[in-house]
């Protein structure tokens, strides 16, 4: 059952190209302003909102006057370069009218899959959210190759949602949800307001993209749903063609909810604790053990020994002085730097390493403390 959007903690909103850009006139300014009002209302209600926005290529086509025919790869990348500037300015103007700051982040799918870049991207987005700014995230179509041809912003939005621990992903599109068959082809198609699990039968209901401006169809949205739901993020597919597309969901306008079976934090920590083989070990003192059990991050001062050859973002096991594993997490340093700062206070790290580094060796959001029974068995 759909909750009110204000009852969610962190929402990622993905916006399709056809919603933002009219082929003849360019940016749909009035629609974007209505979206800005919705985002402002959610932020004022205490909800963190992130936007994954398509539209750079579509907008860049109009800016550069490119022909309506299919674009070559280099033409698409040129259109993206021009469109990203126009798109970022439009979001800044619209949100700025409500006293809200925004920041543009250009990523590719590999940025959410390669662990070191993943940590950097997540830290940047987290900082924007702490500063009450709305991250405007777009696929970096000026340099992407495979992604630019297949249109992965739905999947990218799902990866951003899982990376940031969002509890809801909203895909705004030119269709109002999932039907048993593509409704533009089959007038007898039945609407599905709720999907518990994305099965092969559900996937068979997907069709191709109906709009020429959109690169993704229902199939990519269902792929996004599988990514999101598996990580504990619920997903909504709904039409964004209405003014105030987010408030329309709360008004009861048609939408399909794909419910997640568990909470995002639990899913993320399950992945850390169970699906990754530790690349190294950190032995910590009794004070660090106590801090970790109380929910704190692991600071370098409590680390007594570093074993293994690992890179930043790898999984490491945290051991007590008796050699028992008490926690596991993603480390913010490579092995060489971890050895240099082990045992030192956080305010000494920059001087030791010669660059500004993170205060925590493992942030509490990336750390799973094992239950006492598990630790004894380790």
Curated annotation (Swiss-Prot):
This is Glutamate 5-kinase. Catalyzes the transfer of a phosphate group to glutamate to form L-glutamate 5-phosphate. It is found in: Cytoplasm. InterPro entries: AceGlu_kinase-like_sf (IPR036393), Asp/Glu/Uridylate_kinase (IPR001048), G5K_ProB (IPR041739), Glu/AcGlu_kinase (IPR001057), Glu_5kinase (IPR011529), Glu_5kinase/COase_Synthase (IPR005715), Glutamate_5-kinase_CS (IPR019797), PUA (IPR002478). It catalyses: L-glutamate + ATP = L-glutamyl 5-phosphate + ADP. ATP binds at residues 14, 173-174. It comes from Brucella canis (strain ATCC 23365 / NCTC 10854 / RM-666). The gene is proB. PANTHER family: GLUTAMATE 5-KINASE, ISOPENTENYL PHOSPHATE KINASE. Belongs to the glutamate 5-kinase family. SUPFAM superfamilies: Carbamate kinase-like, PUA domain-like.
